[in-house]
């Protein structure tokens, strides 16, 4: 594993990756795999 990791540098074509959204009232469990599976080519296509 790397000592540091910056997703903004890894995926610069995904402008919303730096946003942190408060979804505390949603009450839905979402795994990291769920989030990554929605990412299309270089994170620009989103979920369908």
Swiss-Prot record:
Enzyme Commission (EC) number: 3.4.22.1
Localization: Lysosome
UniProt cross-references to Gene3D superfamilies, sorted A to Z: 1.20.5.170
Swiss-Prot/TrEMBL keywords: Disulfide bond, Hydrolase, Lysosome, Protease, Thiol protease
Gene Ontology molecular-function annotations: cysteine-type endopeptidase activity
Broad EC category: hydrolase
A GO biological-process term: proteolysis
Reactions listed under catalytic activity: Hydrolysis of proteins with broad specificity for peptide bonds. Preferentially cleaves -Arg-Arg-|-Xaa bonds in small molecule substrates (thus differing from cathepsin L). In addition to being an endopeptidase, shows peptidyl-dipeptidase activity, liberating C-terminal dipeptides
Top-level taxon in the UniProt lineage: Eukaryota
Subunit field text: Dimer of a heavy chain and a light chain cross-linked by a disulfide bond.
Physiological role: Thiol protease which is believed to participate in intracellular degradation and turnover of proteins. Has also been implicated in tumor invasion and metastasis.
Protein name: Cathepsin B
